[in-house]
């Protein structure tokens, strides 16, 4: 399924992880306001969809790859994964996690 593949890509593509994912997680690490968290997370997800489409030559535009519901579910999945690092979700990942 696309959201799981995109989540795996976020965590395992070194270039994307270092340039976009990790800085986003650093920004939201101590944030408690959900709107601020989503304000950082959703643009990072959009960048990832673009990166994913370009890297794997996906014949869809990034905005057509996932519905807004799937993007929201992916955002929740990312946050859950970051907050519960001992629970392996879909991918093996580096150890920097939100506590």
Where are these predicted regions, by residue range?
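Acidic interaction surfaces
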Residues: 1-99
């Amino acid at each position: 399924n696309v959201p799981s593949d995109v989540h795996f890509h976020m965590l395992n593509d070194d270039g994307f992880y270092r340039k976009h994912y990790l800085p986003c997680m650093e920004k939201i690490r101590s944030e408690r306001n959900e709107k601020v968290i989503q304000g950082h997370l959703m643009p990072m997800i959009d960048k990832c969809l673009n990166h994913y489409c370009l890297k794997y030559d996906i014949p869809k535009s990034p905005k057509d790859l996932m519905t807004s519901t799937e993007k929201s579910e992916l955002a929740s999945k990312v946050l859950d994964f970051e907050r519960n690092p001992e629970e392996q979700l879909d991918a093996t990942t580096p150890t920097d996690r939100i506590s």
